[in-house]
């Protein structure tokens, strides 16, 4: 029996756990259906050289849009990863101006002083459903059209198609994060809008076919993850609010 959505689990043995097939997000079902119909049509026409590649394409599309249940730690101190992928950049930078500038709505933006940005690169093999790193209210959702450079490049955060989110907790702590399209990704799909209240680990959007997510930590907060580390959306603790540990690791 696999994890059940909404089930409470803990480190004392409460809850049930086991492997199960992940569900397919509705955004991906239409693509999977198109590929499956094309594969079936080719098979019925005895076009095996076309049918087999289309069959593998169908499996690939369904795998890309898989949406597994995640066990999110419930602790107000924790900032959880919004994305599956690899930590490729950790830098001190000012937050995007779209998250800082007065947008005329009366909603307070982030301070424009440099903070730590953690960049998570998602390959085509990773789950591409993105989740909220903290619980709170979505204060801003800002879409910026742009280029489709390699999402692993630093300049992708300023030149690529991207979508910014600003989440604010009840105590005023704010975290910004940005979905960035990559070489293959051509569509960023949000599931939330400004004013929505979200839980930590709640699904907030997806990027199709390879991309990156940047997280802007609050001032005085440093990551608990390392360069090159693999993280899991909604489960891996990226940081603890107000904590700035120095952590080293070794590749082995």
Swiss-Prot record:
Q: What is this protein called?
A: Phosphatidylserine decarboxylase proenzyme
User: What gene does the UniProt entry assign to this protein?
Assistant: psd
| UniProt membrane topology term | Peripheral membrane protein
Q: Which domain of life is it from?
A: Bacteria
* Enzyme nomenclature, EC number: 4.1.1.65
Give the metabolic or biological pathway: Phospholipid metabolism; phosphatidylethanolamine biosynthesis; phosphatidylethanolamine from CDP-diacylglycerol: step 2/2
User: Which organism does this sequence originate in?
Assistant: Novosphingobium aromaticivorans (strain ATCC 700278 / DSM 12444 / CCUG 56034 / CIP 105152 / NBRC 16084 / F199)
Q: Where, subcellularly, is it found? A: Cell membrane
Which reaction is this enzyme known to catalyze?
A: a 1,2-diacyl-sn-glycero-3-phospho-L-serine + H(+) = a 1,2-diacyl-sn-glycero-3-phosphoethanolamine + CO2
């Amino acid at each position: 029996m696999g994890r059940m959505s909404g089930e409470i689990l803990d480190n004392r043995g409460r809850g049930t756990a086991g492997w199960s097939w992940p569900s397919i997000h509705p955004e991906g079902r239409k693509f999977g259906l198109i590929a499956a119909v094309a594969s079936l049509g080719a098979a019925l026409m005895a076009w095996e050289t076309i049918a087999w590649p289309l069959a593998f394409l169908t499996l690939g599309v369904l795998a890309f849009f898989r949406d597994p249940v995640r066990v999110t730690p419930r602790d107000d101190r924790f900032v959880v990863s919004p994305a599956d992928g690899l930590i490729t950049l950790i830098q001190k930078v000012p937050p995007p101006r779209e998250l800082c500038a007065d947008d005329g709505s009366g909603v307070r933006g982030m301070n424009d002083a440099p903070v730590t940005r953690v960049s998570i690169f998602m390959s085509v093999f990773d789950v591409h459903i993105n989740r909220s790193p903290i619980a709170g209210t979505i204060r801003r959702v800002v879409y910026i059209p742009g280029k489709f450079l390699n999402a692993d490049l630093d300049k992708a955060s300023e030149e690529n198609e991207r979508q910014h989110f600003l989440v604010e907790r009840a105590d005023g702590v704010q975290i910004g994060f940005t979905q960035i399209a990559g070489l293959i990704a051509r569509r960023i799909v949000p599931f939330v809008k400004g004013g929505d209240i979200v839980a930590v680990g709640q699904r907030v959007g997806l990027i199709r076919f390879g991309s990156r997510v940047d997280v802007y930590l609050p001032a005085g907060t440093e990551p608990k993850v390392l360069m090159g580390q693999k993280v899991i959306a909604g489960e891996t603790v990226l940081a603890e609010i107000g904590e700035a540990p120095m952590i080293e690791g070794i590749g082995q």
